[in-house]
Design a protein with these regions (language model features):
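Append "and, occasionally, other polyanion-binding protein interfaces
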Residues: 1-69, 76-85
Length: 85
């Protein structure tokens, strides 16, 4: 099964231009591939509801960091629900 790459997600969501920023930010904060994918999907949802009015890159940085944290929480919650103690 051929899964989409991280680049594919950024291309489909229209954020390919900020991929280097996203990777650097995620690496500095210690997030993994799965959390990045979940976060970019959440960023795209927010972009569709509340697009930036001025500085798209600054907006992306702020929202992506927020969504990375949400993604980690969602993934941990899913794993906890899947594997109860």
């Amino acid at each position: 099964m051929n899964l989409p790459s991280l680049e594919d997600y950024f291309i489909k969501t229209g954020f390919y231009d900020v991929l280097p920023l996203a990777l650097k930010l995620a690496e500095n904060l210690g997030f993994d591939h799965h959390e990045i994918i979940e976060a970019i999907c959440k960023v795209n949802d927010k972009f569709n509801q509340y697009p930036p009015t001025k500085n798209r890159t600054a907006w992306f940085r702020m929202v992506f960091e927020e969504k990375l944290k949400e993604s980690r929480a969602d993934i941990l919650a899913f794993k906890a629900k899947k594997d109860p103690l």
